[in-house]
């Protein structure tokens, strides 16, 4: 996947469907995730004459890590991509862990809309139980994250290693309690293979992107 060089020297993986337009959709993948998870969406947008761009967040795949990043830091990366590609207005779409990053884009002056699909809610606010309805694995994961980077890094190595080599045939087992029956019903065949491939690409270099998302 093409690499885009940022001003601070880091590089991001970028997928652009090549439509010649100053308007675009910018896609934000989940946690963990990779730009390739949006491949079908980019193709569908292209068939409709709509420019679409997906990227791998800092620390995922071959996108360089941005140590200490927070959600709002995504705007600096995206702004530089928009500048280079002469995008004057865009809509952002994100799912799961990409939801907050998608919403953060509304602070970028060129943004004209944002859609969060099953996005992660805010942590630490009085009127939301962040972990309500999540699987036991998420409870363990976020509990480790709250104890610091060394603890969550060890948790990843102890519990998430299988995701680095996951295949379509074992993706449901790998997700464990994180998905329900409705998800399992559609996560088969080509959908399962695509999801597994995205996970492998996301974690091919390290767990850094996942750790920083948490």
For each predicted feature, which ranges?
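Conserved catalytic-core motifs of eukaryotic protein kinase domains, centered on the activation segment
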Residues: 37-38, 63-68, 127
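Conserved HGGG/HGGXW glycine-rich cap/lid loop of the alpha/beta-hydrolase fold
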Residues: 10-62
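Conserved donor sugar-nucleotide recognition element shared by glycan-biosynthetic enzymes
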Residues: 70-75, 99
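Conserved hydrolase catalytic core segment
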Residues: 88-130
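Alpha/beta-hydrolase
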Residues: 134-214
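Conserved acidic catalytic loop of the alpha/beta-hydrolase fold
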Residues: 73-91
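Short acidic-hydrophobic surface loop/beta-edge motif
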Residues: 2-7
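Short, well-ordered alpha-helices that flank and scaffold nucleotide-derived cofactor binding pockets
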Residues: 43, 80, 104-108
């Amino acid at each position: 996947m093409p690499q885009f060089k940022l001003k601070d020297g880091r590089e991001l993986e970028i997928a652009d469907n090549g439509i010649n337009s100053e308007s675009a959709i910018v896609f934000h993948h989940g946690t963990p995730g990779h730009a390739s998870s949006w491949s079908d969406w980019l193709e569908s947008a292209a068939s409709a004459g709509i420019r679409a761009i997906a990227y791998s967040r800092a620390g995922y795949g071959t996108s360089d890590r941005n140590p200490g990043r927070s959600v709002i830091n995504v705007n600096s990366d995206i702004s530089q991509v928009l500048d280079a590609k002469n995008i004057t207005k865009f809509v952002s779409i994100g799912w799961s862990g990409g939801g907050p990053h998608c919403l953060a884009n509304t602070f970028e002056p060129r943004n004209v809309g944002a859609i969060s699909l099953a996005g992660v809610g805010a942590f630490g606010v009085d009127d939301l139980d962040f972990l309500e309805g999540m699987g036991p694995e998420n409870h363990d994961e976020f509990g480790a994250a709250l104890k610091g980077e060394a603890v969550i890094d060890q948790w990843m190595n102890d519990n998430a290693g299988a995701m680095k080599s996951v295949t379509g045939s074992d993706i449901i087992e790998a997700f464990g309690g994180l998905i329900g029956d409705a998800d399992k019903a559609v996560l088969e065949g080509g959908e399962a293979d695509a999801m597994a491939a995205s996970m492998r690409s996301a974690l091919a270099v390290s767990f850094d992107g996942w750790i920083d998302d948490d």
